[in-house]
């Protein structure tokens, strides 16, 4: 007897990925940072795609953003591609923003795989599994064409590639993705003050302390009115602020 499907909550982000390949090494880290940013995320953690495929499609339709994480083994899963088809349909209707993410796979390889007439489209790490999957489903030409259309469409979008030389660690890669998701959801990417604002606040507090508090409670109040005091405290405040800015939301790369 089929279990009853409850109406899902509205998700902000749906993550489409090859579970047993990426869950532990990348996706868990990405999910953590999204949730730390206050973003509601849906991930199919049970890895029983066949049981509730329609349910997953519903979750996609309830979402505002979908992250399509392409990896070397992505095309070993027909369920990943079926989800991608639904994501593409929602994207064409302007009901969903899809962001392609290329994790340890070349973006041009993924794009070539989606073009059945393209030269050299069958020799890549992504292309070969896709070729095999299409052969296994040769009796379902409409389904295969849907996969190819979805791949062509989604990979034309501006996304993120782990192979970009700017990313030394997964942490930097993840933080850029989270920043883009927040931008698409109209969530302020930085709630901190600017350096000018912090400096102004530090000067204001400094003046209040030096001319109103120190004279009442400290014997050597003249020191707190010297340039050394003002410059020193301002430098400490700004250094602390910059340290915080560089380290906020950073977690160590997953092992």
From Swiss-Prot:
It is found in: Nucleus membrane. InterPro entries: TIR_dom, Toll_tir_struct_dom_sf. Residues 9-185 form the TIR domain. GO terms for cellular component: endoplasmic reticulum; nuclear envelope; nuclear membrane. Keywords: Hydrolase, Membrane, NAD, Nucleus, Transmembrane, Transmembrane helix. It comes from Arabidopsis thaliana. Disruption phenotype: Shorter roots. It is an enzyme of class 3 (hydrolase). PROSITE patterns: TIR. The gene is TIK. It catalyses: NAD(+) + H2O = ADP-D-ribose + nicotinamide + H(+). Its main location: nucleus. This is TIR domain-containing protein. The keyword Hydrolase applies. It is a multi-pass membrane protein. Residues 201-255 form the KASH domain. Its EC number is 3.2.2.6. One of its GO terms (molecular function) is NAD+ nucleosidase activity, cyclic ADP-ribose generating. PANTHER family: TIR DOMAIN-CONTAINING PROTEIN, TMV RESISTANCE PROTEIN N-LIKE.
